[in-house]
Structures are given as C-alpha cells and as structure tokens.
Amino acid sequence: MYLSLLLLPMFGSAVTGLLGRKIGVTGAHIITCSCLITSAILAIVAFYEVGLCNSSVSINLISWIDSELMDVSWGFMFDSLTVSMLLPVLVVSSLVHIFSVDYMSADPHNQRFFAYLSMFTFFMLVLVTGDNYLIMFVGWEGIGISSYLLINFWFTRIQANKSAIKALVVNRVGDMFLSIGFFAIFFVFGNLDYSTVFSIAPFINETIITIIGLLLLLAAMGKSAQLGLHTWLPDPSMEGPTPVSALIHAATLVTAGVYLLLRSSPVIEYGPTTLIVITWVGALTAFFAASTGLLQNDLKRVIAYSTCSQMGYLFMACGLSQYNVALFHLVNHAFFKALLFLAAGAVLHATYDQQDQRRLGGLIGFLPFTYTAILIGSLSLIALPWLTGFYSKDLILEVAYGQYEFSGQVAYWLGTLSACLTAFYSLRLISLTFLTYPNASKSVYLHTHDAPTIVMIPLIILSLLAIFFGYVARDLFVGMGSDFLSPSLFTHPSHITLIEAEFGLPQIIKLLPAIGTLLGAGLALYLYHMLPVFTIDLTNSTLGQKLYRFFNGKYYVDVIYNHYIIYGGLQLGYVISKVLDRGIIELVGPYGLATGLTSGSKDIAKLDTGNLTSYALYLAIALVTLIMILLSPVLLNAALINAPLILVLLVAMVCIPYINSSSNDTVTTVQVKL
C-alpha cells in the first residue's frame, strides 16, 4: 500500500506524458486524477495506521551507493511526521487536479500540464518519505525542476521564461547550501541516514552542529522564500497557471524548506545559535511580507505575499523549538491557502484573466459562491476565532511570548503586527474585488459566471477543511500530553514551553493578536468600502505617494538586487572575461603560442643578412659563449668582470639584426633614388 501511495502519481505522470497522444485529453484527466485520488485515500489510511495506531513503516528497496564508508539505499520511512505531510500534499494535489480539468480545458497542451503536475507531486512525496538525506535531495531537486516546467508551462511568453529562470536561479542558492550541508553531515557523522545522524548528534561539538544548522537554514530559506531569497515567490503566482500557484504555495515547494527543519530537529536542537537565527529570520520575513502585501494590486500577488508571511510564522515556530505547532500550522495553511488560490483562479476564469483588483469590483452579485470561498479562506488566514488558522497561528504567537527571551519577545510583537497587516490586506482584497462599485468593462460583467460543478467540489472540500480541520486536529497535534509526533520530532527538555504559553500568559497577551486582527480588518473595510474618498486623497498626497511607491515597490529589494548584485556580477564577469579569458589565458594559450612562434621566427629570420662580417660575429659570439660555459666554475669567481661582458654580448646579439636590417633598407633607398 505504501509503495502504491508513492508510485501512483509517477505512473500517472509517465503514462500521460509518454502516451498523451494515444489516450487523449479525457484519458489524461481520468488517469492522473484517478491516481492522485487513490493516493490521497491511501494517505488517509496511512495517517490512521501510522499516526493514530502508532505503527511506523520502513521500506528498504535496493542498495544505491555502496562505496567504502558510504552506504545509501533506496529506503522510505513512514512515521507520524511523514504521514502528516502526506495528508496536505496529496489531498491538495488531488483537488488541484480536479480543479484543473475545467480550468485548463481550453488549453491545447492538457496532457503535458497534467504530466508535469503529477510529477511535481511525486517528487514531493519522495522528499517527505525518504529515510536519508540523499533521497531527500533527489526529491528536493525534483520539485525544483518540476516547478520550473510548470511556471514556464506557457513557454511562448517571455515573462514566463524569465520568471521560471528567476525561480530556478534563486532556488539554486539554497540548493548550494543544502549540498554543502549534506557534505558536512557526511563528513562529521559518516552517514546520511536519519537514524544514524540523529543518534550521534548529541555527542557532536556545538560549534559544528551550529554550522550544519545554519547551512540547513540557508537551504530552507531558499525553498521557503524567506527574507533575502523571497524574490522568486510572486513570479510563479503571476506567470504560471493558477492551479500551479495553488500547489506551489499550499502543499509542495514552499513547505519543503520547513519540512527540512522539522526533519532535522534532532540536529538543530543542539545548536542554540541556529535556533535564535531561525526565529529572527521568521519574524522579519513575516513582517516584511505582510507589509509588502499591503498595497499590492494584483489579486494573486497579494495571496503570494501572504504565503511568504505565513512561512515566516512557521520559521518562528521552528526557531522557538515548537515543531509540533509549526507542523500543525503548515497543514492548516495548506488547506486555506489552496482555497484562496483556487478561488482566485475561479475569479480570473470568470473575468477573462483580469488580475488587477482595481479593475474588478462588484463581483459579489455575479460570483456569490466564489466570494464565499475567498471569504472563508481569508478569515481563516487572518486567524478569525474558531476557524482553522486560529488554532495554530495564535498559538505560535503565544509560545513566542512564553519563551520570556529577547528573541521570543521580538517574534511576538512582529508577529502580532504582521497579523494586523494580514487582516488589512485580506479585507482590502475582498473589498476591492467584490464589494466596491464595478470597475471592469461592461463586456466582462455580461459574460461573468460562477464556478461550474467540477470547480465547486474542490472549493467546498477546502472550505470545510478551512473551517473545521483546526478544531478537529488541535488536540492531536498540539494537545497537552499528546505523543502523536514524539517519535518524529525532538524538542530539548529545556525548550518545552507549551504549558507556560497555555496557562501562564496574561489574558491581554492572548487577546492582543485577535484585537489587532479585528482592527486591521475593520480599517480596510472602512477605507476601501465605506470611505474611499479618504483613500484617494491620501494617495494624491506627497506622503501617500511615497509610501505607496515604497510598499508597492516591495521595499525596492528587486531594484537593489538588480543594481548592486546582478549588475555588479555582470560587470565582474565582463572584467574577468576581458582580463583572464581573452587576456592572460589567450596570451599563454594557443593564440599566444602561435603568435609568439610566428613573431620569433620572423626575428630569427632577420639574422640571415647575407653579410660575411655578420656571420663572423655570430661565430665569435658562439665561441665566446661556449668558452664561458666551459670555464664557468672559474669565471664565477670573477662575476664583476663576467657580468658586463655577458651583457654586452647579449645586447650585440639582439641589436645586430635590426642594425643590419636598417642598413639594408638605407642602401635600398639610396639605390632607388639613384
């Protein structure tokens, strides 16, 4: 069953990709959707057997690398962490496949799209089920190339090409640090198996553990779009098909970095410096992304920046050693983020791909079902009480404050402020898209229609999960005394603060995020729905324009990267190419050798003057040189006499050909004049 769960998506991808012309579009839909739905059902069964019944499964297929100390097998492990990751990955992926049947119905390349989508899911399954770091690396690189293919699915668009390359290159930075980290793990531990590495980690020097932890953190920052390596995230949401955005942002690519930290918890727990850095990175990313999303106008880009912000919350939880809370929020986030992106796709599908919120408005009467789906997803995103997001997002802030350390306090206040900003831009999105006066052209509203039944099914399922899953699964993931994740995640005893956060915090600290959320949501509705004149006046003011350009321009991070890093790198490459490749290497390489031999042969040819006295001089110089070589032991004692003589002879040898050549030219000139 467990291998079937893993291989079915790959089977669907291979059949659809290789036999797409034979089976047709309908066949591609049936095969890929059937494989994914079956895998999702098997994942639910595996969650019951492994997670609830506490019966972990390990499968060792064949040996892969057996070279002296290095022994790596194709092995897969199903523990509580693995099955918890399989649940959102396969449920969301199967719903995205169903949604794509209608969304991509007019595209002529359906078979290729569904093959890429299933391959993407397969590599994510490889990443989360592998029992060693090398198999994780296979899945890690696989989702990277799959995301490139999906973002660049409409490859005739230059912007899609550029976005795919940008995503691939930025992720290469994280991949480089991941490779170095795995080399460091093998060098220190002598093995890449999780069980071996985790059992030896407590006995390794803290400095070494910190270095390995920081390398893994930098790798996770690339995949999970943390501050500094976040620039690739909005582009796939803009240029790829919307189902791709839902899969990338909800369940696969961006969660891979968080999974790396969760799986490596037995290692990074022994590096306190690493944990502090992770906390700061997460807190700063959450605030940065939330403030950047405030004044974005593209519908999908706003949701994309909310993903970046929520990944910051997950990093905060990992840095605070609350890995079970991070996993709980990861699963919750997958459901309501997939709901938001698929509902946004339904809006785009109904409005002829109009993504600018300012050119929409008034859609609540035309798309009531889609409006309800986006409303549920947004309310769960802002952690409205008793929805799914509330049970995990607020808990992250509580455990941050409950640490009673400086990094925890900073994380709490930045996270609370980010929650206010998240509520603001979420309700701003709803207001501009659905509640304000219609701003689109009349032709758009004439043909606007709500989602068909095949699109409603995924939205209904995700809406129910966004409402009820947090309440149902809370005690299992983060309940007091729950040992559901204890076999998979490790928290050092000195870092256990969940009880203090639950019972020891002042009530105002617990209520403050909810109060800020309500204030942010109310302010957005007031400014954009009830009093838009004030917003227009603020935009026309000098201060308002500067603030708008700053936040809409994403803190000018792309400008800084382009001007100081990319442009500087291109200039450095030009200088290296000019001085080294086309300079020194050419000079000492084939070109320099050929040129030198040609020039030297011409200089030697000038010695053949045809003058008898020149030949006599050459013979005399050769004879003197031979005598000096033979008598060098004796003459070395008279260096002051020997050196000037040698210098005179060398100068004579060099100058004679040119003197002869000059005299010959003079004679020729005189003869011509006569």
UniProtKB/Swiss-Prot annotation:
GO terms for cellular component: mitochondrial inner membrane; respiratory chain complex I. It catalyses: a ubiquinone + NADH + 5 H(+)(in) = a ubiquinol + NAD(+) + 4 H(+)(out). It is found in: Mitochondrion inner membrane. The chain crosses the membrane at residues 27-47, 81-101, 113-133, 135-155, 173-193, 200-220, 242-262, 275-295, 301-323, 325-345, 363-383, 410-430, 453-473, 514-534, 556-576, 616-636, 639-659. It holds the Pfam family Proton_antipo_M. It is a multi-pass membrane protein. It is an enzyme of class 7 (translocase). Its EC number is 7.1.1.2. Keywords: Electron transport, Membrane, Mitochondrion, Mitochondrion inner membrane, NAD, Respiratory chain, Translocase, Transmembrane, Transmembrane helix, Transport, Ubiquinone. One of its GO terms (molecular function) is NADH dehydrogenase (ubiquinone) activity. InterPro entries: NADH_DH_su5_C, NADHpl_OxRdtase_5_subgr, ND/Mrp_TM, NU5C-like, Proton_antipo_N. The keyword Mitochondrion applies. Its main location: mitochondrion. It comes from the Eukaryota. Belongs to the complex I subunit 5 family. Core subunit of the mitochondrial membrane respiratory chain NADH dehydrogenase (Complex I) that is believed to belong to the minimal assembly required for catalysis. Complex I functions in the transfer of electrons from NADH to the respiratory chain. The immediate electron acceptor for the enzyme is believed to be ubiquinone. This is NADH-ubiquinone oxidoreductase chain 5. It comes from Mycosarcoma maydis (Corn smut fungus). The gene is ND5.
